[in-house]
Amino acid sequence: QTGLDKKNLLRKTEPIEIVSDKMEAFQEKKMIIFSGNTVATQGDIKLKTDQLTIYYKDANQKKEKIGKQEIQTTGDLERIEAKGNVNVTQKEISATSEEAVYYQEDAKIIMTGNSVLKQGKNIIKGCKVIIYLDENRGDVQKCDAEKSGRVTAIIHPQDKKIKD
């Protein structure tokens, strides 16, 4: 178990605030790219990355105004891709990687490339971290056969103070 709170993580109905240096909208491709010091916040979850790409589903298109530009969106996310220096935090839990993809329909996040999951002092490292939001669990996997490396965990037992 990762300790991630599935009720708070990537809520479908709560808005996501995204701040970046640049935004490009591609209506025909149904995607929006945010780049440069990108920070996405939803509730108590914060994602920082170099570039964030949002992909929308085809059906039920509607127009939304973002700044002065009107873009066509569906409101339903297909997936969100984060590339470069990915850092996801929620309360005392953080996960870092080179890339991450959130699949809304499957309610999972796949983080790849030097993935590290931290909770308090505990640290788990691997090539891939998969977070299953509906199941409130996560898997950390080793690298492929052609790459070296295994899953590494550093667990700190909790200090229990004894009262005299």
Locate the predicted segments by residue.
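Mature-chain termini and adjacent capping regions
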Residues: Q1-D164
